[in-house]
Amino acid sequence: TFNNGTQADASLKEKDETTGLAVIAVELDTLNEDFLKNDITIATLGSSNIKDIAGLPVVALGRPMGTNGSLGYGIITSSASESAASDTTYRILQTNIVGSQNAGGVLFNLQGQVIGIITNGKSATDMKNMVCAYGITELKRHIEKMSNGEKFAYLGLKGVDVTEEANSELGVPYGAYIKEVEMDSP
């Protein structure tokens, strides 16, 4: 169902269990030409790798309050957090928007560009109702692959980059440090 109530059958192109993202497709020939021309706008993907992203005003649309059609307005408060997943790491954009633990949707900058996909469960334990999002820059490649119906390569490793501090204090060599290997991974 589109925002104006128009309904159409959709098919699942691909889904990513790690991020909870899915790409669904609607056959264009099933939609009215006027509807396509006047009511559909393609979202522009921006960048979440902005140097001074903290303090950036944002609008959260979709389900940031846990109900369809809700929205919130605030700023990015931090982009220092990361979420390690199998074979990748996602940047987490934290906001000061009070939302729901069942939040979902999209985070836009004031130019109307998508800069994040809202996720739940990535907030600090003492800030569970603050809206957080995966940075869009890290997701662009995944979205493109899912849109093309491509599967993800999967090795089953969770790792981090070795920092200068870890190298000097712990003697860990520079490079990738494997924190975890998923059971039954290749």
Predicted features along the sequence, with ranges:
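Conserved positions in beta-strands of structured domains
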Residues: 11-14, 77, 158-160, 179
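Residue-level recognition of short loop/turn positions
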Residues: 4, 110-111, 186
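Conserved active-site neighborhood of the chymotrypsin/trypsin-like protease fold
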Residues: 1-62, 66-67, 101, 153
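Flexible, gly/ser-rich surface segments that form the specificity/activation loops bordering the active-site cleft
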Residues: 48-88, 123-126, 145-146, 150
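Active-site region of chymotrypsin-like
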Residues: 27-43, 70-132, 171-182
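Short, conserved beta-turn/loop elements at beta-strand boundaries and strand-helix junctions
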Residues: 15-20, 77-86, 162-167
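Extracytoplasmic/secreted envelope proteins and their assembly/folding machinery
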Residues: 21, 52, 58, 73, ...
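C-terminal cap/linker of serine protease catalytic domains
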Residues: 10, 110, 114-173
